[in-house]
Every structure is written in structure tokens, then in C-alpha cells.
């Protein structure tokens, strides 16, 4: 417990709120342009194809893209769902939300908006993947 003299000398510092998605700048989503899309197969690792592999206990080839946001930040965003059509220069919508087993990936691409199409043949949990209700 500080003395009154110590409190006069140095006031109490307020607890600063640190954002987990600084590139969004307080907005729920941001538009951006893909500068590079990382995907590919385990056998074929050519110069323009790279893959992001998850941390230790998991093993996969996760699909991510480098996105230049309208806020000026260049970020790495995860592409959820099976299959995607994102290429370089695709315009995408980015939301917050990290991927636990991919270090440095703190954003998700929103499927079903702008140039990112929804997941094909998805029946359950469609809202997260931009799929309309089947007739």
C-alpha cells in the first residue's frame, strides 16, 4: 500500500485496454486486397506456392492470405472452410479472431462477401461460411 506522499509523487496509472486486433482500428470489419494467397499441396512446394503449417501437436496445411487493409496495415488472415477462390488482387472483408495453432494469424476472412464466395455444399453452420439456405 503506497503512502500519501508516494501517491502525490506518482499517481496511479489506469489499466490500459490492449486490443487483440489493432489493424481493424476499432471497426468490426475492414475491407482489404489480397497481396498473396498461401495454399498448395505437401508434395508441390514451388516458388509462388507456400503453405502455413500449424504448431506442434497439430498437422495440416492451413489456407491463409496476406491482405492489405484500407487502414494501411498488411496482415495475415485465415480463410475458413473447405475450398476457396481467393487469388491475388481479390477484395475481401476481414474480421477479428485468431487461429490458435497458427502463430501470428489474428484475423479471419469473411466468406460470402465481396470476392470471397461461400463454402460449396455446406449444410450446417452456414452463417459462418456465407451459404444461403438450401431450397
Curated annotation (Swiss-Prot):
Gene Ontology cellular component list: chloroplast; ribosome; small ribosomal subunit
An example Gene Ontology molecular-function term: structural constituent of ribosome
HAMAP family: Ribosomal_uS12_B (MF_00403_B)
Keyword Transferase: no
Protein name (database record): Small ribosomal subunit protein uS12cy
Keywords, comma-separated and alphabetical: Chloroplast, Plastid, Ribonucleoprotein, Ribosomal protein, RNA-binding, rRNA-binding
Chief subcellular location: plastid
Subunit structure comment from the entry: Part of the 30S ribosomal subunit.
PANTHER family: 30S RIBOSOMAL PROTEIN S12 FAMILY MEMBER
Keyword Chloroplast assigned: yes
GO biological process: translation
Source organism of this protein record: Populus trichocarpa (Western balsam poplar)
Compartments where located: Plastid, Chloroplast
Signal peptide extent: none
Family membership: Belongs to the universal ribosomal protein uS12 family.
Lineage: Eukaryota, Viridiplantae, Streptophyta, Embryophyta, Tracheophyta
Gene name as annotated: rps12-B
Amino acid at each position: 500500500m503506497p503512502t500519501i506522499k508516494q501517491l502525490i509523487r506518482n499517481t496511479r496509472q489506469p489499466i490500459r485496454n490492449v486490443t487483440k486486433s489493432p489493424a481493424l482500428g476499432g471497426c468490426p470489419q475492414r475491407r482489404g486486397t489480397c497481396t498473396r494467397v498461401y495454399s498448395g499441396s505437401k508434395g508441390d512446394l514451388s516458388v509462388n506456392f507456400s503453405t502455413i503449417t500449424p504448431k506442434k501437436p497439430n498437422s495440416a496445411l492451413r489456407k491463409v492470405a496476406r491482405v492489405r487493409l484500407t487502414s494501411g496495415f498488411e496482415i495475415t488472415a485465415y480463410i475458413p472452410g473447405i475450398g476457396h477462390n481467393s487469388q491475388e488482387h481479390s477484395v475481401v472483408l476481414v474480421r477479428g479472431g485468431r487461429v490458435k495453432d497458427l502463430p501470428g494469424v489474428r484475423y479471419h476472412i469473411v466468406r460470402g462477401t465481396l470476392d470471397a464466395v461461400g463454402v460449396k455444399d455446406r449444410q450446417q453452420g452456414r452463417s459462418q461460411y456465407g451459404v444461403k439456405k438450401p431450397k
